[in-house]
Amino acid sequence: MDNMLTLDQVTELRSILNQRLAFIAGPNLSSDLCSDFVIIATADDFLGVQGDVHQGHLEGFSELYSSIETCKVEKEDLEEARKHGNQYFFKKGEIISRIFLVRDRVQGFVDGKEAWTYNSDIGIVLKLESGHVAITRLGYHDEMLKVTYLDELSVENLPATTGRFEVDVHSNYSLTRSLISV
């Protein structure tokens, strides 16, 4: 099963390249920097990043799987974030020089043989002049997003993503995480 951003969403992400970061915000983005909706504000534009859940089917099993999506930012969302003090100005004024997708590949094995593969975009990373801002899903099955500021970018520095993939005497799974430049 594949659960990745669409070409249109990747194009929306590219629209903030080479712009100056103004702030990160969200109507419910409290000081722990977790929410299902995050606003990336630049000097020229606003881009929303939203976590959502959808029914998916993997190897005949129906389950809720989360996704990360880009979306429009409504004036009301910005006003709510401002009203509640949920705007964060760390790294303000720095240019967004690159954008990466964070893609996970989860492979399930039964009796040592590959049984299924789940590919999912679990986040985005903005490369700035003095570090990075990552917006990643916290789980494969819930919509919560986490904003993380990083000095150095590596897959090991990103928050772990939790899942409900079971391990027993016959089955296990492996995870491969990669960064893909857009």
Features from the language model and the residues they span:
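Surface-exposed, interaction-prone regions used to assemble/regulate multi-protein complexes
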Residues: 1-182
